[in-house]
């Protein structure tokens, strides 16, 4: 226990020893956030918390790798199953575990970035004989992404389309979603 508290100031030690519920550590660069989190993880493991019940999320790959190395060094084999990820890695892992509940997707799905999405939209525009100058792929991708972020289904989007342009965007959205499913891919 004293090893996990060594070199910590009183506020940091309190954060490490608080084991009831989740904890959010927010502080400036170089303030010891990574040290506090790694010490807290080691402390939780020492208290008998199962590693798979611990989740630590960082922003960068570098921070995640550094934290993983520190936790492994402090806790050894007990740290193997701690969930320690970047935001993106955690979300991808979670999706891979749960994607089958959406129907039609396998856990080996691809995640389309903006370039992939725009290329797929360009393909759809060609299929529909629509001009890329009028139906700009980046703009269409943005519209689809916004609809998804607002949980607007293809059907709802289509019902709201009141003019020719938006009706075509709705048709593109529907084809886009169908092609994602066929390609076992997801996008934002």
Question: For each predicted feature, which ranges?
Answer:
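Conserved RecA-like helicase ATPase core segment
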Residues: 2-7, 33, 37, 43
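Pre-Walker A adenine-sensing motif
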Residues: 6-17
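Small-residue (primarily alanine) positions within well-ordered alpha-helices
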Residues: 15, 27-29, 56, 63-64
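Walker A/P-loop
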Residues: 20-39
